[in-house]
């Protein structure tokens, strides 16, 4: 379903890269709508935590077989008034039926191309078998107390629209924490401090820009001191992300068109 800052469009290539590592336990401290963790090998021990309690409650309900209803505008108003994070319907209405997946944004039921309420419901039903064994926890990344071989962080992006209760997110504190982790760690963000290496980027086709007028670009960062620990046979997959060769030329042409329009991307 729609979730501001979600990784649904890039979840499979990101998960494919992580799954090629020799680790067997995985943690997402900002699991969000669980797009990436759902694509990770089910044989791995997978942990997903988040400070957005309503999403954790929703994911826990979905993994046990709960099927969300179609949220009407009237139902959404009632859910918003109650705003009960322990009701799994709350997150469906709060994000899945909101404009662009923003927390309690304008109600979005359907357009000429898509029924958003139905899409949210169907997406969650399809998600259920993929997250059945995931251990979800409502917690801040600092206090989660979870240990894993590989950590993937998708924190709220700096200087972009906030998600849920994360508008006061301390970015400096996060990077300090990430730089001290002994586990392999990867981060998606617009930029990173010294000591981090960008290994991939993609211009997101979202139909709107960041607050500063720039296009949103997804970037994956790895710690420079940890590079030797990543699978060194994956240089090609890091560069072109294991894409079907037939798609590479199309992507290169699209990327060239974007760069000609907005300037060379970093």
Locations of the language-model features?
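Active-site segment flanking the S-adenosylmethionine/decSAM binding pocket
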Residues: 135-170
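Class I S-adenosyl-L-methionine-dependent methyltransferase module
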Residues: 42-142
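Short, polar loop motifs at secondary-structure junctions
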Residues: 31-35, 121-122, 187-193
